Amino acid sequence: MSKTHKAWRIHAHHDLRFEDVETPKPAPNGVLVAIEAGMVLSYMGRVMAGQVPYNLPPMPFVPGTNAIGRVIAAGENVGHVRSGDRVFLSPHLRGDVPSAEPPQILIGLTATSPTAEALALQARWRDGVFAQVAHWPAACITPLTLLDDKPATELIALAKLIVPFGGLQRTGLRGGETIIVNGATGYFGSGAVMLAVAMGAGRVVAVGRKPEVLESLRDRFGPRVIPAIVSGDAGKDLAIIRHAAGGSARVALDLLGSAKSTSTTLSCLRALKRGGRLVLMGSAEVPLELSMREMLANDWEVVGQFMYERQAPAQLAALVAEGLLDLRHVQVTTFKLADFERAVDSAALMQGLDLTAVVS
């Protein structure tokens, strides 16, 4: 193992450097991984410019959240992976403390709150995946034993799908049911449509404003996908969504990104049957105004979901291994690690089932 490796590091906003860094030995609960492919978030450029209100790791740090790689070495307390294993790296780390609200971070990106516990956890695991080698907490590593025959450029699609997978699990979607997906033409929303079909939904109401993208989802995933083209007119949108759902939707997942209005979100809620559940994973920039009278009269649930449960990556990988989910539907554009800055520009243009990755 080389004593140094190449990595991109953020030293300050607008100060990104590609440099040689020391290759560490794995901590007792850590794993050293050779990165094969790392996902580039669509808003990574804004993060690096300081335009997103995140609690960034202490600088300098290596950015980047999810990746596919191979284990170089595992710490002495790690038993579920060993050298040579193909693995999925998740950035979602919870502090292992006896607390009702344990600290949470997204490695290489942000702490969910600026508490002393969260910032200490982030300082310990600050570096992400845009490097030749990553040192990762074992708790955030999932072995991909049954998927070792697939290329990293295909497996990196797991990184795009894991967030909506967590949301779909929170909805409690059951086989044969109808689900409404709001923001279906977006980066995560399109993945939710793909996943809902794989998870056995009887009907997936794909809500969005881009007819061509919605039609492409139906063409790709079949007649169970029902496009619902909305305009922002609350009354008309509600009628369109209800009609597409056939009046039978019990659950909905909202993945609308950076929305200036919650009108469509409310239309999706109102399209649910009595006792329905709406799961929020989007990033609306305005409050969601709920009517207590409506909520009580309809026994609705509105819940937030941050990321996914710890076992979710293994469950998602199992869908692929069993042939229920074909990752090749995700359209991956790759760049060499040295071309990371070009990859960031490309990622900003992604929509639908696109994904940008850097490969080593």
Regions found by a protein language model. Name each.
Residues 140, 145-233:
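Mid-domain Rossmann-like dinucleotide-binding core that forms the NAD(H)/NADP(H) cofactor-binding site
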Residues 2-3, 166, 236, 266, ...:
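C-terminal hydrophobic helical "lid"/dimerization subdomain
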